[in-house]
């Protein structure tokens, strides 16, 4: 049995909090968990969840992952705790880190996540912020690795809003040396600091391309990835974004320009006829539900690394 203790007691706030070797270590552990070749016991360990945003896959995958590891999950609903009444983050963090062994947080402001980590004495995990979604990126690259058995020569194209998911794909892609292309409307590009940091990591700067032309971005791509155009908290921008993102739908025409063996990814929920057509979503190229399942296996690996 492998003892996955390389990340013990570290925070995981960003894809940049782990090294290339550590990414591969997590992916390797994830595959072992998926194939039932690894047994880790986190009995008496407690995971605390603080979710300011709604969630299906992230919440459930963390809960199931911790349960399968023998641990317990406490769901701390902000609306039924003192968080809702404005208790300072530093006070909440110092108390919860005496009750819990690890805390996963989904919040709007990345700075709030960093504040929790600053005051917590236990590991803090980014379960999504406005800046990054690093757990999602790990599951994404696990899915890609399962499909192609290697990252060499893989081209990943993300079509849509340069949001938290795109930011984490860029950073994790840089760590793995994967060519990442982002196609988004002008003004909706990924975070500039994320782009600059990725360029520092890439040995070949040409492996990261940001464009406003989806047709160019998908040429020869092995993976086509998209996400909702309007993230949580942007409901008032939906009508405007639907107009701006017209032409950035993954449809059969766009897919035909990619590699003939290309696969389709989406972090869900998906809005058919918006970012992706129903025909493409339901095609044989769909690896979206493998991708969703892999969230659970990655979470098992990550929790094991932090706690075992």
Swiss-Prot record:
Q: Which family, according to the similarity comment?
A: Belongs to the aspartate/ornithine carbamoyltransferase superfamily. OTCase family.
**A Pfam family that the UniProt record links to this protein:** OTCace
Described purpose of this protein according to its UniProt entry = Reversibly catalyzes the transfer of the carbamoyl group from carbamoyl phosphate (CP) to the N(epsilon) atom of ornithine (ORN) to produce L-citrulline.
Per its UniProt entry, which superkingdom is the organism in?
Bacteria
- GO biological process annotations for this chain's record? arginine biosynthetic process via ornithine; citrulline biosynthetic process; L-arginine biosynthetic process
Offer an example of a GO molecular function term for this protein. ornithine carbamoyltransferase activity
Q: Which reaction does it catalyse?
A: carbamoyl phosphate + L-ornithine = L-citrulline + phosphate + H(+)
Pathway(s) annotated for this protein in UniProt: Amino-acid biosynthesis; L-arginine biosynthesis; L-arginine from L-ornithine and carbamoyl phosphate: step 1/3
Query: Could you say which enzyme class this protein belongs to?
Result: transferase
Q: Tell me the protein's name.
A: Ornithine carbamoyltransferase
Q: What is its main location?
A: cytoplasm
Residues annotated for carbamoyl phosphate binding in this entry: 55-58, 82, 106, 133-136, 267-268, 295
Q: Which keywords belong to this entry?
A: Amino-acid biosynthesis, Arginine biosynthesis, Cytoplasm, Transferase
The EC number(s) this enzyme carries: 2.1.3.3
UniProt GO cellular component terms: cytoplasm
Which residues are L-ornithine-binding? 164, 227, 231-232
Point out the gene that encodes the protein.
argF
Where it sits in the cell: the answer is: Cytoplasm
> Cytoplasm: present as a keyword of the record?
yes
Tell me the disulfide pairings in this chain.
Answer: none
């Amino acid at each position: 049995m492998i003892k996955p203790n390389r990340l013990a007691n570290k925070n995981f706030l960003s894809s940049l909090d782990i090294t290339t070797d550590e990414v591969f270590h997590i992916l390797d552990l994830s595959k072992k968990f998926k194939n039932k070749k690894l047994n880790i016991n986190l009995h008496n360990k407690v995971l605390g969840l603080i979710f300011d945003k709604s969630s299906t896959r992230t919440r459930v995958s963390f809960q199931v992952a911790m349960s399968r590891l023998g641990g317990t999950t406490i769901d701390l609903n902000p609306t039924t705790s003192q968080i809702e009444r404005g208790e300072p983050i530093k006070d909440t963090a110092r108390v919860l880190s005496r009750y819990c062994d690890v805390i996963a947080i989904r919040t709007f402001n990345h700075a709030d996540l960093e504040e929790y980590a600053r005051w917590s004495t236990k590991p803090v995990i980014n379960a999504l912020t406005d800046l990054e979604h690093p757990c999602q990126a790990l599951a994404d690259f696990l899915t890609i690795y399962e499909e192609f058995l290697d990252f060499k020569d893989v081209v990943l194209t993300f079509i849509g809003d340069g949001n938290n998911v795109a930011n984490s794909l860029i950073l994790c892609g840089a760590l793995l040396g994967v060519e990442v292309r982002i196609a988004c409307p002008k003004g909706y590009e990924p975070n500039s600091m994320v782009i600059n940091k990725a360029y520092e990591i890439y040995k070949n700067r040409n492996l990261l391309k940001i464009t406003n032309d989806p047709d160019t971005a998908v040429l020869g791509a092995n993976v086509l990835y998209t996400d909702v155009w309007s993230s949580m908290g942007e409901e008032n921008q939906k009508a405007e974004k639907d107009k701006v993102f017209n032409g950035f739908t993954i449809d059969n025409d766009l897919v035909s320009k990619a590699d003939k063996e290309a696969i389709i990814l989406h972090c869900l929920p998906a809005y058919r006829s918006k970012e992706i057509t129903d025909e493409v979503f339901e095609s044989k190229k769909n690896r979206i539900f493998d991708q969703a399942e892999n969230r659970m296996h990655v979470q098992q690996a990550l929790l094991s690394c932090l706690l075992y």
